[in-house]
Amino acid sequence: MKQGITPQYWKQENNGRYFTKETQIFSPLPILTDTLLAHPKVRNDGQLAFPAIHFIEGISREVGQEVMQSFSLPYPSNPEAHIVKVAQNGIFVYALSQRGLFYGAISIIQMLQDGYLPYGLAYDEPVCSERGLKVFLPSRKNMDFFKQFVDMLAFFKYNTLMIEIGGAMEYKKHPEINQEWIKYCADMAEYSGKTKEIQDYTFPWYKNAIHMENGDGEFLSQNDVKDLVLYCKERFFEVIPEVPSLGHCDYLMLGHPEIAEIPEDPYPDTYCPSNPASYELLFDVLDEIIEVFEPEVINIGHDEYYSIAMCERCKGKAGADIFAEDIIKIYDYLKQKNVRTMIWGDKLLKNAIVPDAGPFGGAEIIMYTPQFKKDTGKKVGIMPATWQAIHQIPKDVEILHWLWSLDEKLEDEVLEEGFSIRYGNFEGYLFPHWAEHLKKGSKGAIISNWSTLNEVILQRNVIFFGLAYAYEMFWNHDYRDEDYAIIRDKTLSYLFHYHYPDLQNHTRSLEALAHPSWIEVGYATDYFVEYQWFVDGVFPEMETYQIGNILLTYTDQTEFTLPIIFGENIGKTSVEWDRTTNTNPLPGEPIYKVDEQLFEVSLSTKPYQKEQQTFFAFPIQNPYPEKELKNVEVQTEADKDCQIFVDQIAYYH
């Protein structure tokens, strides 16, 4: 097992040197130097220095053979593989591509301890070629955080970022899309869960999820988006715009209800594929997105296509024919632009089954209201099958397989037809038999956050935990399902130290200090709210989740109050740590189950166990270190029927 975030293969000697201000950096790309110097505590001045760091594109036979002999590996040939050779005369990074050199810079950062690096040889190579995140566009206020998040993904050596556009980017040819998008999102944000009421309970037809969090209900200028794309590409990310089409495209019809498949729907989400005007609008949108992103591939959505053959133009047509013809039209248009096509793959699947809902994906589906409530709902119609389209669309359409949790064999329906797949909506900590699936041909995986792009939501949706856990799957060739507990604990540690790098520069004490740099409260609660994903218009409400306050009091009567928020900076004492295994799953049932409330607070806190209870270490940077700290008090809100248990308070100096 690899210990810590370091290259998997690393031979160290007893001696070493320091990366200091005297160390020169010889790099073919400014981003390599910038990346090295951007991380805190990679340099330590006043010590025996490495004379230089050299980045070299290409691997000499001598260096390649040294890797083979040192680690019993084949000769390095992966373009993302990188070698870090550390010697008295300098640090030498070798790779076959510029992206590989970039990951070499990341490996140096991972290996350095207070600027020190022992002599030796390190080698790292990914397990899979596609390692990504799917996100919404940020709002303007979150653009800086977006870049910080990209830097975090780079630290964990991700190489793909899929960004859903929808109505959240300026359209110069169709400003009505943006104008109506703002109104629509404001309407949907009236209260948490309004979108779910509209989607599941309001209409006698099936509706798509409403992505009103995209851009935080606003839109970015094309120049702003270009800036974000450039930032990603400088760090060697492939940026894939996601342009929902056919279904999930409410943004197109907000200003153009005349192209809706269901004209009477006040919130239409599916255009009529028999109406030429649908493609005139869609292709205008694609043209502007292609100009801004300059992409190699576009994800055109096509997931959860529900409103099938319902308008007068489409009635009588086979669902599979409609679905395939729409994909082919868009595929042909993108091919003329030298852009590849990707889709979500659920509507190509014949045998997907959702527990308590019945057939799903591309099967013929009996529809109920409330939506998918087979046991309690009222039958309202039949959704035509689309799975036969798998025989009609071009084989180089790239497939995002996101129904992996319903049945491990579902992917075979796509692979056996000759398509390439990568897993979507990926949750590595729940994914079984990773190595076996890669051998079958998967290109990798993409984790999804279907909500606002900010730190709190990403944490509470377990995105941070998921991306750090999946790092072990993406870069550790010895990854095994049986190592879950070890990787879980390492992941919790990774995130905590990544989020609080300054703590490593201070000494921790359980004795109260007058002028601490940080105060760390180890606590937990018996408060309980069932875990939920904050997606599709469901957002955390403070009146539900705030259960108390941390009060810092100083001798001059100054006070500082920090809210205690369940699921954000505190968790329950009874949280479950183990992953349970369903040895005989029924169709659609997952093999693994976990308690997400352990991971929901990872990043801002470090969960730990003590006497069969769980506590959460939550650091607070002292807002007034120059003042004398008198008291640290943990208070419970009077209207909350719960207790907050304090295990210990630590001080850093």
Label each residue range with its predicted role.
Residues H174-G215, P355-W387, V594-F599:
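Charged, glycine/proline-rich intrinsically disordered loops and linkers
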